[in-house]
């Protein structure tokens, strides 16, 4: 009960911070920058422990700098020449790997590049979603998060009822034994319905078919992203990948 209360409280706070960040001008840039840095740091701690801190630090700095430049381009018309800054940091990271890491470290050092692809790269797209026409409009990203949050609730409700019946097929039993196909499709259907509501409420300004597709794709991507995270945690033998948000590992 205490764990549930903690999860609920932190969820409410997280949602409030995300909504405020997406609606308050220019706050979203700082919000996603912090999320990127913390998420990458948590992955590195899970995968590498305290090893290669100088390399992982340069990796986070390079991705963070690239995000700042992209945000500056969309929000303030910053010159693309500023991309030289993250490129220089990235080259320093590669130099640090080549000059200081041993041959037997090669398989482990490869984990340095994983969060650059699965965490930093998607977040680098957010400035283009926040400034679709040159002016800040956080409603599209807000719609994405609303779909994720509520489809997750729908997936849980359907999965915990219909998905627990005898004979119900598991989605990926070797990774997450509790996830069922009932929950998966329940979440997708819920996501499409929520997306439609957001469209007709005027929150999501995309066309109706694009909005419905956004709902379905977002739900599917969130499920398999969650499974990928569970796969990493099983691989590294950890229960939680991080402790930044209490009650949410």
Model regions and ranges:
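Membrane-embedded alpha-helical bundles of polytopic integral membrane proteins
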Residues: 1-216
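Interfacial loop-to-transmembrane junctions
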Residues: 234-249
